[in-house]
Amino acid sequence: MLLLAGLLRRARPPRRPSVRRLSGLLDRYGFVPPASLTPHSASDDGGAKKRRPKKPPYRPPSSLDRGGRPAARSDLPFDFRFSYTESSPGDKPIGLREPKYSPFGPGRLDRPWTGLCAPAVDTTLRDAHADDPAPAAERELEEARRRERERVLGEPLTPAERAFLVSKCQKSRTKKQINLGRDGLTHNMLNDIHNHWKNDEAVRVKCLGVPTVDMQNVCHQLEDKTGGLIIHRHGGQLILYRGRHYNPKKRPVIPLMLWKPAEPVYPRLIKTTIEGLTVEETKEMRKKGLYVPVLTKLAKNGYYASLVPMVRDAFLTDELVRIDSKGLPKSDYRKIGVKLRDLVPCIIVSFDKEQIIVWRGKDYNGTIQDNTQKTSVSVLEEESAGAESENGDQEQASSDWASDECSQLSSSDEMPDDKSAISEADSD
């Protein structure tokens, strides 16, 4: 009992919560404490602390990011291709190597990419069974382009004007030129040509490699796709004139390709057996072709405009022709073989040991078949004919026309040689 009483005496009463006394100075001075000094209770926090918003991850600048801008629209009335000289709408592939990714970038062009080209007119409007599969809209675009080209070119150049432009574009006068290589006339080259035309009336184009086998096609595509006019040609060097009424501020919109699209899959060039021959005859011909005397040796990135006439002349005496292409890339001499097959024409026998072996065929009758001649007269011929009638000088007109001594393939174009006009201008 005594122990219990002692414990009760020692027990202290519970503490009362202390009452906070406010200072009387608050009533005297009317001081209001700022919010930062006011104590916050747990109930005022809302039960959770507000977190700072996270920064968005860093995104490097990219040309694919349009930033909400609409897709580019071009009024050019032809299908956009990677190369206009090394690809043809008539070549039908058997497959694609990759999905149909547009080389112009996602959302950058209002034309769909079919894997081969970006057509100017919807391909679903074509009627494959009609005499003219091109729709009416496409024919109207071609007619509008022809009229616009005639308007921009204006009146034909006089011999003195042409001689002045040609001399101005020579290597001794300027280093500006556009190099046309194994890929031919590419789509982005059109933009480069218009950039040169911004400051100069004419631009020099240097052609080397595979496209020079068919120089007539190169000249035709340059004039057709750019709207200019070739006023001079010497070998693989071309002078492309923009026209009298060309306005750089009204140049066409040419969207650039951001990468080279993959080549589609085409049928095999070399079949197991040649058409019209048996398996044994095909093997014997391929062995025999490797021992035929070499017609010529191709240099890398050379000028091959004389190759087609040489093969045609060789077929007058020999049925097999061998062309040495050692040192050339495999894709180059295979493309050359395809061009020979279409231009000579002939049959490809083999590409073994970097040799192009072609056969003239069973039904060869010795006549030269030129599939590259065009029925339409070039604008340059019309201009020269008009100048001849005005001047009345027959000798002057005949000297202005000169065929390329290195190639007869492009003789149908009859590009003028301005050496006589240049010499007359210098003598004056």
Curated annotation (Swiss-Prot):
Biased composition (Polar residues): 394-413
Protein's UniProt keywords contain Repeat: yes
Domain CRM: 155-253, 275-371
Keywords assigned: Mitochondrion, mRNA processing, mRNA splicing, Repeat, Ribonucleoprotein, RNA-binding, Transit peptide
Stretch forming the transit peptide: 1-21
Primary localization: mitochondrion
Region annotation Disordered: where it falls in the sequence: 33-100, 129-152, 378-428
SUPFAM superfamilies reported for this sequence: YhbY-like (SSF75471)
Domain of life: Eukaryota
Keyword Repeat in record: yes
GO cellular component annotations of the record: mitochondrion; ribonucleoprotein complex
Compositional bias per record (Acidic residues), positions renumbered to this chain: 380-393
A Pfam match: CRS1_YhbY
Localization per Swiss-Prot or TrEMBL: Mitochondrion
Molecular-function GO term, any one: RNA binding
Function per UniProt: May be involved in the splicing of group IIB introns in mitochondria.
Protein name in UniProt: CRS2-associated factor 1, mitochondrial
